[in-house]
Amino acid sequence: MTNSRVLETAAAGKISSAVTTQLLEKGVPTRALVHRNDARSNRLQALGAEVVVADMFDIQQVAAAVDGVDRVFFNPPYHPHVLDSAVAFAVAARRSGVEAVVALGQWLASPEYPSLMTRQAWLTDQLFELLPDTAHVAVDPGYFADNYLKLLPMASQLGVLPLPTGGGRNAPPSNEDIARVAVGALLDPHRHDGRAYRPTGPALLSGAEIADAMGEALGRRVRHIEIPNWMFMKAVRVNAKRLGFDVFVQSGLRHYLRESALGTWEVGGPTTHVRDVAGVEPEDFLTIARRYVGGPETRRTAGNFMRQLWNFTLTGIVPMHRLDKFDRLQQHPQPAQPRLAAQSAIWRHEHGSAGRYGVLRTHPASPSQHVA
């Protein structure tokens, strides 16, 4: 494996940078594709990565980035035209004779899903499977620990975790464990060819248990507050700049939030895929949370307290984004009968006994065969 060069896309991001770092630690030659040079890319270069700057939507730049590599970790941009990027990489991989593609996808991916990004994740998975003579492995996590920990500043300052769970539980994985599964697949892609893995944490947690773990990491009591999805989405709008959530991200998030009450994150979880592929036990939520508590926004200062209190107040004032209107104005296509994952017979078939994650996948059934 040490003679095989691996390309990681979106290498400055949290998951891809972890993939790059872990590969370098194992002595694997890496090429880190970034959108621009900055402190993050400089760090990867200092660790020994070859850093290339490329636009993931430009086929010529993509082809140049792929040329000379043997394996690709495809981490898609969260963008309405993400499928264009996937096609560009598939074409480049085919022309360059890439040996393997390990692609980061979504546990919710379905051709019926109301989120454009999630439907395109499903199509991307099908696309890479079509590449002849190229091993393909899917890494499809659900709702990450990182998503919950974006609320750590409020938990630190106000002692509350306002989160809509609908009574559902989740076993959220760390970015590092997601990366470990991807690295395991990249090191031995032919062993994992045709498989889909869903990294999770070691235990299903309720909202209250997530709040308790945050509180232990912070050294203070944190109380989970069940709030409706619409209120959470207003809070996301208030904090959108800090979170890095543009309107397209918010349009998808509103659908993902509804899955918790339907038990979607509990289906098949927790998995053993981190242990099976990476050979280590998955990190528990408390361990993950402790890595986040040193940030400047979690420090107990008067300024941070007032900032979080003001954001909390703004949540009750600002109007909601009209996200359905946004989708229409952006001309985002919709399936004839959009369904959440838990409501989709296709999704249940692909994620149930006929298409179990971690074993060789069956080809997806035709949508016409699964009418709910």
Regions found by a protein language model. Give the residues of each.
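Oxidoreductase cofactor-interface core, primarily capturing Rossmann-like NAD(P)-dependent enzymes
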Residues: 1-43, 57-60, 67, 78-81, ...
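Active-site regions of enzymes building and remodeling cell-envelope glycoconjugates
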Residues: 46-53, 161
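Structural motif detector for alpha-helix initiation sites
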Residues: 175, 207, 229, 284-285
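Short amphipathic alpha-helical surface patches that mediate protein-protein
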Residues: 201, 215, 230, 290-294
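A hydrophobic C-terminal alpha-helical subdomain
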Residues: 233-372
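Cofactor-binding loops of NAD(P)H-dependent oxidoreductases
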Residues: 54, 227
